[in-house]
């Protein structure tokens, strides 16, 4: 029996498939099934989720499904030009993805996808031999270039002769034109005049008035053209075979890359699904605890989060209550989330959720009925339960929905209790739903079982779909009947038919529900107040930081004015020292020292104020005692990587001070003596006209800084910007050479330029 299907596992996988970027990922997701060791998959998904949150989308351009090309390769056929382009684009995408992931901080992703094999030589060869429009390039071989050159010359000669023929034989032609059919130039000759032309008749018009003839003088020319076309076809076939053989000789590596990209696509879809639905990665634990768990198949605007915990000293939860109250969804979610976690999927829940590994997950859900086998509801359930009981052990998670239903309530309850006892003796973990009172009582008195119910609003006579732990559910039949208008005497008659014990139990359950509902409501109010308090606290902290920054800026301004004043006074005192008497000179010197000490104390106080703030990625900083302002690009432990424009330096955090706003502005404007020059520029999105002064300035900077090589990032797009850049570089005498980048440099989206230095 496929218990995963009963738990809606395939439907959730289909939801995740929507986030793949190729069919490779879809097929990989279909292979995922629960395993007792899902750690590696979960860690990979977690790292990729962190990647998406911090860096955005990974580079996946060109990573399409090349399975059809692989099948053709294995069959021994040569790939067509457009197929080779697809494979080349895929392999270039593999290189780009590998380079991106290996330079990030995610260890598992690095280890896994550093195994992608580079096909740099093949990619270069395809780029050389095949144009982007799918035509084999003249660069592919000298022979192909020569054949095409001959074809062009011969075509020019034939067309000239054909034009002359039309001009000189206009009286015998039906129209003043010629046609090219099946590799031959033909002329529409009037049928009555066909004997006046020596040549071969190829076609006759439907009316019979025109014959399409190949004059004798064109036969040899056409034969030569056909021969050149055949030579061209053979040479192209040879080139395509050569490129295909490059792949065939590395077929295992190609298959490995396809498998790795399928895996990455699958991980990407799972991480994307989590990111868009506020999901998290839950690692295996020794407990079962759901915190705001949301069933993926229920729309966001309708789903009610589930909170449920199985204490360590319990082996099962018995959930009771009215129909349509959410019991089935609750137990299904426990089984589904366990299966998803064990298969390497993220879960839609909050931090604090814990789930155990179960080698066996078995379920019988009420809505699954063997109608095709013509079995009754009870027989349908019992058939599955027999199989579950037979296979259950201490490694089993068992989900049973509406246990004991579909038959006489007394016998059904007795059978349900016996089944629960047997499963507990075997050590299985149980999540059971029922509406039978004897089962509720049994659960209340059993040390390994926990009672739970679905909350019911007596005012609206509708379920809230929230789980209440520790109290069994009531049927609420009398309340609902009374609310809907059933006469009171009938309801009282019904009550009188209940035994004293049943009435007391129902009253006790109702009282417990009311008390727990009130407590839950109070708990929700407190939680809401706590959240509002945390928001206010965050706001006040932010306001305090803003106010503090303003005060520091005011202090900096005052300090600057004081420094200016001290410099002015010092200058006047220095001038006075030269003309004053010795006693006066000594006194003046003391005054200067006092003023300088005050200035240093004020500066020290300002620096200490700066140091109190935490340094993060993106902050502008300067080294202690220095004036150069840099930008923090990475923080690891107690060390930061700081970009000072002309170089990057690792500096202990204790040696860094946050720059003032004015210093940041100065850095951006370039007024500090810190070079902001880079060996690359990004002109994507510019027109050729907008890019021209930027490119020329870049060449100036390369030459002035004595740097031989630079990188111009223009993107691939239509190629218009790249063409414009090359035209600018071609006219600049300082440029020694330029070319497109290698795959690792950015491919055709980057131009690498070398200048004289």
Swiss-Prot record:
Its EC number is 3.1.-.-, 3.6.4.-. HAMAP family: MutS2 (MF_00092). PANTHER family: OS10G0509000 PROTEIN, OS10G0509000 PROTEIN-RELATED. Signal peptide: none annotated. It holds the Pfam family MutS_V. SUPFAM superfamilies: DNA repair protein MutS, domain III, P-loop containing nucleoside triphosphate hydrolases, SMR domain-like. This is Endonuclease MutS2. Belongs to the DNA mismatch repair MutS family. MutS2 subfamily. GO terms for biological process: mismatch repair; negative regulation of DNA recombination; rescue of stalled ribosome. It comes from the Bacteria. Residues 681-756 form the Smr domain. One of its GO terms (molecular function) is endonuclease activity. The keyword Transferase does not apply. ATP binds at residues 321-328. Endonuclease that is involved in the suppression of homologous recombination and thus may have a key role in the control of bacterial genetic diversity. It comes from Thermotoga neapolitana (strain ATCC 49049 / DSM 4359 / NBRC 107923 / NS-E). Homodimer. Binds to stalled ribosomes, contacting rRNA. Keywords: ATP-binding, DNA-binding, Endonuclease, Hydrolase, Nuclease, Nucleotide-binding, RNA-binding, rRNA-binding.
């Amino acid at each position: 029996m496929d218990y995963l299907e009963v738990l809606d596992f395939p439907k959730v996988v289909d939801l995740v498939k929507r986030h793949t970027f190729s069919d490779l990922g879809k097929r990989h997701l279909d292979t995922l099934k629960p395993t007792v060791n899902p750690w590696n998959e979960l860690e990979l998904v977690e790292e990729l989720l962190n990647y998406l949150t911090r860096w955005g989308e990974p580079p996946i351009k060109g990573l399409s499904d090349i399975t059809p090309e692989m099948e053709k390769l294995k069959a021994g056929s040569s790939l067509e030009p457009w197929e080779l382009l697809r494979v080349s684009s895929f392999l270039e995408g593999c290189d780009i993805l590998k380079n991106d992931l290996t330079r990030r901080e995610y260890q598992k992703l690095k280890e896994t996808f550093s195994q992608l094999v580079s096909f740099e030589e093949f990619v270069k060869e395809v780029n050389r031999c095949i144009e982007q429009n799918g035509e084999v390039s003249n660069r592919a071989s000298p022979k192909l270039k020569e054949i095409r050159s001959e074809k062009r010359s011969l075509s020019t000669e034939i067309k000239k002769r054909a034009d002359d023929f039309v001009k000189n034989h206009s009286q015998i032609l039906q129209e003043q034109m010629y046609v090219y059919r099946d590799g031959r130039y033909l002329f529409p000759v009037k049928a009555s005049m066909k004997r006046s032309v020596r040549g071969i008749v190829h076609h006759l018009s439907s009316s019979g008035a025109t014959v399409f003839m190949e004059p004798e003088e064109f036969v040899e020319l056409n034969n030569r053209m056909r021969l050149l076309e055949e030579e061209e076809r053979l040479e192209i076939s040879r080139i395509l075979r050569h490129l295909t053989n490059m792949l065939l000789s590395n077929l295992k590596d190609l298959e490995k890359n396809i498998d790795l990209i399928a895996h990455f696509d699958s991980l990407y879809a799972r991480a994307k699904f989590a990111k868009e639905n506020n999901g998290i990665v839950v690692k295996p634990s020794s407990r079962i605890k759901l915190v705001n768990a949301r069933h993926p198949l229920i729309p966001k605007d309708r789903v009610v989060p589930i909170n449920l915990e199985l204490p360590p000293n319990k082996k099962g939860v018995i959930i009771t209550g009215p129909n349509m109250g959410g019991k089935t969804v609750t137990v299904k979610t426990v089984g589904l989330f366990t299966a998803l976690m064990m298969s390497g999927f993220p879960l839609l829940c909050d931090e604090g959720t814990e789930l155990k590994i179960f080698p066996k997950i078995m379920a019988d859900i009420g809505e699954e009925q063997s109608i095709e086998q013509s079995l009754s509801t009870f027989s349908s359930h019992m058939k599955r339960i027999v199989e579950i009981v037979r296979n259950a052990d201490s490694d089993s998670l068992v989900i049973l929905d509406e246990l004991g239903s579909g038959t006489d309530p007394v016998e059904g309850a007795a059978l349900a209790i016996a089944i629960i006892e047997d499963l507990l003796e075997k050590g299985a973990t149980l999540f059971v739903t029922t509406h039978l009172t004897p089962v509720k009582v049994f659960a209340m008195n059993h040390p390994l079982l926990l009672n739970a119910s679905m909350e019911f609003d007596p005012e609206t006579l509708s379920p809230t779909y929230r789980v209440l732990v520790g109290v069994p559910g009531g049927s609420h039949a009398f309340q609902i009947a009374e609310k809907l208008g059933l006469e009171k005497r009938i309801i009282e008659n019904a009550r009188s038919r209940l035994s004293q014990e049943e009435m007391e139990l129902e009253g006790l359950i109702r009282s417990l529900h009311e008390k727990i509902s009130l407590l839950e409501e109070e708990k929700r109010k407190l939680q809401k107040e706590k959240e509002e308090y945390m928001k206010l606290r965050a706001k006040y902290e932010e306001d305090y930081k803003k106010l503090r920054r303003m005060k520091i800026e005011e202090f900096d301004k005052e300090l600057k004015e004081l420094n200016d004043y001290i410099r002015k006074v010092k200058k006047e005192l220095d001038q006075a020292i030269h003309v004053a008497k010795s006693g006066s000179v000594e006194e003046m010197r003391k005054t200067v020292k006092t003023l300088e000490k005050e200035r240093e104390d004020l500066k020290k106080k300002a620096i200490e104020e700066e140091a109190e703030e935490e340094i993060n990625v993106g902050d502008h900083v300067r080294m202690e005692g220095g004036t150069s302002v840099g930008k923090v690009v990475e923080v690891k432990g107690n060390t930061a990587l700081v970009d000072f424009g002309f170089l990057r330096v690792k500096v202990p955090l204790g040696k860094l001070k946050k720059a003032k706003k004015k210093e940041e502005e100065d850095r951006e404007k370039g007024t500090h003596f810190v070079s902001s020059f880079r060996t690359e520029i990004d002109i994507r999105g510019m027109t050729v006209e907008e890019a021209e002064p930027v490119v020329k300035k870049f060449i100036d900077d390369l030459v002035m800084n004595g740097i031989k090589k630079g990188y111009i990032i223009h993107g691939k797009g239509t190629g218009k910007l790249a063409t414009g850049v090359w035209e600018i570089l071609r006219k600049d005498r300082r440029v020694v050479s330029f070319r497109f980048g290698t795959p690792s440099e950015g491919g055709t989206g980057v131009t690498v330029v070398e200048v004289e230095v």
